[in-house]
């Protein structure tokens, strides 16, 4: 079900970003990011980057501008940057004690402010009600240029 959810999110984003009469070349690159506390593929990787490819010729470049990144908060395989490890640890255990960098401290202040603001909390609950209940916290982030995803504080990773 997860790959089909990804497909749905990409389609929904693309449909909203291509005005009638525009060429397909004007579609922006889109990265859908899932941050999960469970391993979506069972390989214990912190980062799984998914892109479309040609099955018969895997080395063929197929740049459709769509990319999906799964971030598993407890993964240990691969070589993710230390800042990403700290961010994912904070995402799962969001407390002031786990805000170990300046960027995470800024993020924690924003999270605290949002939690205190009743209107924002109500809007969040209504959006969750409309979307349904998911096991994983999901974030969709549009990226205009390149193949990057953005972590707290605007730090870009390849």
Predicted regions and their residues:
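Short, charged alpha-helical interaction segments and adjacent helix-coil junctions
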Residues: 1, 75, 81-158
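Accessory alpha/beta interaction modules
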Residues: 1-67, 77
């Amino acid at each position: 079900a997860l790959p089909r959810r990804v497909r749905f999110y990409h389609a929904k984003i693309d449909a909203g970003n291509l005005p009638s009469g525009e060429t397909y070349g004007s579609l922006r690159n889109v990265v859908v990011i899932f941050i999960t506390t469970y391993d979506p593929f069972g390989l214990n990787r912190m980062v799984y980057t998914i892109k479309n490819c040609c099955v018969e010729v895997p080395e063929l470049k197929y740049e459709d501008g769509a990319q999906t990144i799964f971030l598993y908060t407890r993964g240990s395989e691969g070589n993710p940057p230390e800042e990403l490890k700290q961010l994912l640890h904070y995402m799962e255990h969001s407390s002031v004690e786990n805000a170990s960098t300046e960027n995470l401290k800024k993020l924690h202040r924003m999270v605290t402010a949002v939690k205190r603001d009743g209107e924002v909390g109500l809007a969040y609950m209504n959006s969750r009600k409309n979307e349904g209940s998911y096991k994983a916290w999901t974030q969709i982030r549009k990226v205009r240029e390149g193949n990057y995803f953005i972590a707290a504080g605007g730090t870009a990773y390849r």
